From Swiss-Prot:
Positions glycosylated per UniProt: N197, N235
Naturally occurring in which organism (per UniProt): Mus musculus (Mouse)
Matches recorded under PROSITE patterns: TRYPSIN_DOM, TRYPSIN_HIS, TRYPSIN_SER
Record lineage: Eukaryota, Metazoa, Chordata, Craniata, Vertebrata
Keyword hit for Nucleotidyltransferase: no
Name of the coding gene: Prss29
Name the UniProt record assigns to this protein: Serine protease 29
Subunit and interaction comment: Homooligomer, heterodimer and heterotetramer. Able to form homo- and hetero- tetrameric structures. Heterotetramer is far more stable than the homotetramer.
Gene Ontology biological process terms from the UniProt entry: blastocyst hatching; embryo implantation; proteolysis
Amino acid sequence: MLIQLCLTLFFLGCSIAGTPAPGPEDVLMGIVGGHSAPQGKWPWQVSLRIYRYYWAFWVHNCGGSIIHPQWVLTAAHCIRERDADPSVFRIRVGEAYLYGGKELLSVSRVIIHPDFVHAGLGSDVALLQLAVSVQSFPNVKPVKLPSESLEVTKKDVCWVTGWGAVSTHRSLPPPYRLQQVQVKIIDNSLCEEMYHNATRHRNRGQKLILKDMLCAGNQGQDSCYGDSGGPLVCNVTGSWTLVGVVSWGYGCALRDFPGVYARVQSFLPWITQQMQRFS
């Protein structure tokens, strides 16, 4: 099911990038303007699954990133319910192809950021604790978290990955291989200006791009439906660093509408606190 989410805060008609898929054959899974990722290139990428009784199948719902052998960071809007039952989720790790292969991993704990209400209001992050450690799994490796002082700019080499739709109206075709695309970081003030100019009177006087958000994308290259919760990584001093979590945007890869991400840097204290508390 492809859900066009209208953010009531600013009446945009903007879309959440990751939503439950309709079924294993028609699943809205690709990155707009990207290409297939080699096996093992992005070893922290995971697929967050929910069970569809109609098909008796665990379908792709969102992306996520392994940040510790037993912890996954994703978007809060992928979880939806603050008291979500961990047993309704499964995690797929270490595979470029969405279906087939390894067994799915169980989730033992779900933690949504306490300030989350809606993706457009910020705090769009959640943690999933895995029932088992993936320390010894092949093609699996945690991604590096940013330092509190890290500043990423348009000069940095950044990529976003996922199994989301390859255009606003076209799902990723079989064999459902992980997609990757290089995107440009866009300064928050410029991103704010772009959204305001493109939507004009619909958001007059309302701040759209908050401090805990990050913008990235190019016309024709972006994350899309089914990518939510997935990683935006930048090559910082030779190491891939997780700087963003796919959150929301207006359509996919449209001119003047960059993708909007949860800024991982803003949530470092919360992430560290939760992992220490429950590990």
